[in-house]
A protein has these predicted regions:
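Phosphate/nucleotide-binding beta-alpha loop and adjacent structural elements of enzyme active sites
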Residues: 1-117
Length: 117
């Protein structure tokens, strides 16, 4: 799957797991107060950046562990109606890279977004 990460697409080790979309999560969840937490080693970029505002707005909070910088994720969340705070990035050596990342170096941290009502 494009954008999921090097280790998920190029490894013969490990175990296959089903992949679900944000739409699938929303269909499963019957709750009104939804929180989305991401720590998926790089897939957060393609998932968040390609998600329509209407889908993101179904979550009251979005918490993301980012791996390659935060700027494009923060911008997308702000434009989707969220108040956003984030942890200052820490540098780590490059592990893998995908098309949705800002850089090939790992700058990790956390983003917390609250939907503006």
């Amino acid at each position: 799957i494009k954008g999921v990460g090097y280790s998920a697409t190029n490894s013969e080790l490990g175990k296959s797991v089903p992949i679900i979309t944000l739409n699938d999560i929303l269909k499963i969840s019957k709750l009104d107060d939804r929180i989305l937490k991401f720590d998926c080693e790089g897939c957060e970029y393609e998932t968040i950046l390609s998600a329509p505002k209407e889908i993101l707005q179904k979550f009251n909070q979005i918490i993301i562990a980012y791996h390659y910088g935060h700027k494009n994720l923060v911008e997308k969340l702000k434009h989707s109606g969220f108040e956003v705070s984030y942890m200052k990035p820490r540098y780590f050596p490059r592990v893998f890279y995908n098309d949705f990342t800002e850089e090939s170096k790992m700058f990790i941290g956390h983003i917390h977004a609250n939907k503006i009502i």
